[in-house]
């Protein structure tokens, strides 16, 4: 949980823990991650902080600037913008020391790649080079050329789109908060939201387009609401 204390997070570490992971904006709770706190704990334990920045996109937040070592995105969401392809992105900040003794796969020869020692051959780029040359080769997670083209098309208007998404979500969240059939609304810009101050630090230009809310009336009310939607689709 983003609200776990440093002691609670520390207690969860094991000798074989290899990374600390979090989401800039959590799905579906819309909690905002204290990136600097999690980076501090990760580095104290000699592991990288990996942040899923899908909801925020690089337009609203750049986690590496707050101490994250690796950032991942599902490009199928906002980066695409049209739901036309499936893909993902890994961004390596080049900030983590892979020679600290916990990651022999970077410091010992890779027999499948002519005995390459990634930290010696590529320095700060060791992680991302290994991901591209060995891991992608072995797992086959390769974007199609046309899929990459569609992503590029979506990236061009991304700053404008995510600005409008954030403005719309803010307006809808405030409207829902006042509705008599709504039990609760979670969106960081609302007064009283526990993440409002943190969002002002990490997401000063908007909090993306996803809202979480609960209806009065429980499951039956939720089912009626979903079945009554005209402009939105039920997607899982």
Give residue spans per PLM region:
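Conserved PLP-enzyme active-site core in the AAT-like
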Residues: 1-178
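Conserved C-terminal alpha-helix-loop-beta "cap" of PLP-dependent enzymes
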Residues: 162, 181-236
């Amino acid at each position: 949980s983003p609200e776990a204390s440093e002691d609670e997070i520390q207690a969860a570490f094991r000798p074989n823990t290899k990374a600390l992971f979090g989401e800039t904006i959590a799905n579906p709770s819309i909690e905002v991650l204290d990136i600097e706190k999690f980076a501090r704990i990760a580095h104290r334990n000699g592991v990288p902080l990996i942040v899923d920045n899908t909801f925020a996109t690089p337009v609203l937040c750049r986690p590496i600037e707050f101490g994250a070592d690796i950032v991942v995105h599902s490009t199928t969401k906002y980066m695409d913008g049209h739901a036309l392809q499936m893909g993902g992105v890994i961004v390596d900040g080049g900030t983590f020391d892979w020679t600290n003794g916990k990651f022999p796969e970077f410091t010992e020869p890779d027999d499948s790649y002519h005995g390459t020692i990634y930290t010696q051959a590529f320095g700060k780029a060791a992680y991302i080079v290994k991901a591209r040359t060995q891991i992608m080769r072995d797992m086959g997670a390769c974007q199609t050329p046309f899929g990459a083209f569609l992503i590029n098309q979506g990236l061009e208007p991304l700053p404008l789109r995510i600005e409008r998404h954030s403005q719309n979500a803010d307006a809808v969240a405030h409207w829902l908060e006042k509705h008599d059939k709504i039990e609760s609304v979670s969106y960081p810009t609302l007064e009283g939201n526990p993440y409002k101050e943190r969002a002002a630090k990490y997401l000063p230009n908007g909090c993306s387009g996803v809202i979480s809310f609960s209806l009065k009336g429980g499951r039956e009310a939720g089912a009626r609401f979903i079945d009554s939607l005209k402009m939105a689709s039920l997607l899982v």
